[in-house]
């Protein structure tokens, strides 16, 4: 396990890229005009380097041009045929004891559980949305520990059993907005990140919080094979400003739909920051470090012109290759049952978090 944050990512390597995502105090004069939504292709919603790496894998297997015209899900099925042995099935989640929160959108219609657990981005287990559910059974979550260090008074290493007993668990129904312009509504179970950080007592030098995912190539095929993992450098890392991390909305998740997290959703511990794009909500966390300097983040290092440090949901600031004005709602229907809705500033949490970004230029700090 590499408990370090001093690595670099792939593609364009830029230091101290302080691009911040969408901010809260945007006025009408500061807003960007909305583009007319257009139909997205797979190339639109997948980073270009990853899109073409996927094609190289298929071509290396001798797959024809006709096959390349198939949807990504069909290509994934074809690749699975070449694999031979199926990965082990993920264990069923264990029921959790928790208190439903009345303060966090109990009126929202939930995304079906099979979609929440079967439609994921977790490139450590493959590029297609069904890959994590199919391949994450190899993840071993027994004896999991989380290290907290850096600019803290009390550095510590905690195990999951302690965390589950240390904080009362609550269920919060949060909106989830992916940077790829799709969305869900999910009943997460967990506790506030700020409560965890207070255990370690951040010092006055601490300004940022850095997070790191497990690094285990023997369990995560995308870490072992760059084609499977989209060409990213691993382990996956993310970061928040300390005031963001201490905000009550920042949530450490241990369960979903009444049970412990399945591996494909980031077991046993993940972050959820509902006002930011989904890639900020790092999965399978093993290391949290408080730091004075802004930490590197995986997608910003991979494509700094496309993915900023802040990653706040903002319908007025488009991705370079697609509009963020609307989003596709993942529901119970199939491919022909497509519903789109307007994207809300800060994913609908502007009243709670806009003050964090007062005076910040949303176009530069995306």
From Swiss-Prot:
It comes from the Bacteria. Residues 1-76 form the signal peptide. The keyword ATP-binding does not apply. One of its GO terms (biological process) is protein repair. Residues 1-22 have a biased composition (Low complexity). It holds the Pfam family Oxidored_molyb. InterPro entries: MsrP, OxRdtase_Mopterin-bd_dom, OxRdtase_Mopterin-bd_sf. Its main location: periplasm. SUPFAM superfamilies: Oxidoreductase molybdopterin-binding domain (SSF56524). It is an enzyme of class 1 (oxidoreductase). GO terms for cellular component: periplasmic space. It catalyses: L-methionyl-[protein] + a quinone + H2O = L-methionyl-(S)-S-oxide-[protein] + a quinol; L-methionyl-[protein] + a quinone + H2O = L-methionyl-(R)-S-oxide-[protein] + a quinol. One of its GO terms (molecular function) is oxidoreductase activity, acting on a sulfur group of donors, quinone or similar compound as acceptor. Residues 23-33 have a biased composition (Polar residues). Predicted to be exported by the Tat system. The position of the signal peptide cleavage has not been experimentally proven. Keywords: Metal-binding, Molybdenum, Oxidoreductase, Periplasm, Signal. Residues 1-40 are annotated as: Disordered. The keyword Metal-binding applies. Binds 1 Mo-molybdopterin (Mo-MPT) cofactor per subunit. It is found in: Periplasm. PANTHER family: PROTEIN-METHIONINE-SULFOXIDE REDUCTASE (PTHR43032), PROTEIN-METHIONINE-SULFOXIDE REDUCTASE CATALYTIC SUBUNIT MSRP (PTHR43032:SF3). Belongs to the MsrP family. Part of the MsrPQ system that repairs oxidized periplasmic proteins containing methionine sulfoxide residues (Met-O), using respiratory chain electrons. Thus protects these proteins from oxidative-stress damage caused by reactive species of oxygen and chlorine generated by the host defense mechanisms. MsrPQ is essential for the maintenance of envelope integrity under bleach stress, rescuing a wide series of structurally unrelated periplasmic proteins from methionine oxidation. Heterodimer of a catalytic subunit (MsrP) and a heme-binding subunit (MsrQ). HAMAP family: MsrP. This is Protein-methionine-sulfoxide reductase catalytic subunit MsrP. It comes from Yersinia pseudotuberculosis serotype I (strain IP32953).
């Amino acid at each position: 396990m590499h408990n370090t944050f001093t690595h670099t990512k792939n593609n364009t390597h830029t230091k101290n890229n302080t691009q911040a995502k969408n901010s809260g105090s945007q006025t009408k004069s500061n807003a960007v005009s909305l583009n007319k939504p257009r139909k997205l292709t797979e190339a639109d919603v997948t980073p270009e380097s990853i899109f073409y790496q996927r094609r190289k894998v298929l071509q290396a297997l001798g797959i024809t041009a006709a096959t390349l015209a198939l949807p990504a899900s069909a290509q994934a099925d074809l690749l699975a045929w070449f694999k031979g042995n199926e990965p082990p099935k993920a264990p069923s989640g264990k029921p959790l004891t928790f208190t439903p929160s009345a303060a966090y959108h109990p009126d929202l219609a939930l995304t079906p559980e099979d979609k929440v657990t079967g439609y994921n981005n977790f490139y450590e287990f493959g590029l297609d949305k069904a890959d994590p559910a199919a391949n994450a059974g190899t993840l071993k979550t027994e004896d999991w520990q989380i290290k907290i260090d850096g600019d803290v008074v009390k550095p510590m290493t905690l195990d999951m059993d302690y965390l589950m007993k240390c904080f009362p668990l609550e269920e919060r129904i949060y909106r989830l907005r992916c940077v790829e312009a799709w969305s869900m509504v999910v009943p997460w179970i967990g506790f506030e990140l700020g409560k965890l950080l207070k255990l370690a007592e951040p010092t006055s030098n601490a300004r940022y919080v850095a997070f790191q995912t497990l690094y285990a190539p023997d369990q995560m095929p995308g870490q072992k094979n760059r084609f499977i993992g989209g060409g990213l450098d691993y382990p996956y890392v993310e970061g928040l400003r300390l005031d963001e991390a201490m905000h009550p909305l920042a949530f450490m998740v241990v369960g979903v739909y009444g049970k412990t997290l399945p591996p494909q959703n980031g077991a046993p511990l993940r972050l959820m920051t509902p006002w930011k794009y989904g890639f900020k909500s790092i999965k399978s966390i093993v290391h949290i470090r408080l730091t004075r300097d802004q930490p590197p983040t995986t997608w910003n290092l991979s494509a700094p012109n496309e993915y900023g440090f802040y990653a706040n949901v903002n319908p007025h600031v488009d991705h370079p290759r697609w509009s963020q004005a609307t989003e596709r709602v993942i529901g119970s229907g199939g491919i022909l049952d497509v519903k789109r809705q307007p994207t809300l500033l800060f994913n609908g949490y502007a009243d709670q978090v806009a003050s964090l970004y007062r005076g910040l230029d949303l176009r530069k700090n995306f």
